[in-house]
């Protein structure tokens, strides 16, 4: 599953530019498997958060507030070693790895948006990677929590 922000990458990779600014589910079987690692709707919410970041927020992927928040979290090493659901339905937190949110500010925003938006039950893990829910996000990365409050509420 992927959000396609622009036509140029699609053209370069032999895909139809008509897919630009859309979320594409490449393979339903893969989506069905991947969704087990998130809470209800989490994987789709992740991709829709990319679309919101690109299309709605000021300066899109170059949004200064998100970039600054991401840079601060990376400098502090907040996401260098976090729990991840790596076993699907059982949702066991037995693995610790560098978070996918470390990839770039786009993944940081999408990953944390899932934790923030998916639900407010502090006993449910909505995200694949730590922080798993809004309550955990508030204590794990309070700066990001405040930013997401401004963006989403």
Residue ranges and their predicted role:
Residues 1-75:
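Acidic/His-rich structured neighborhood in mature extracellular/periplasmic domains
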Residues 4, 9-12, 19, 26, ...:
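Metalloprotease/metallohydrolase-associated module, dominated by Zn2+-dependent proteases
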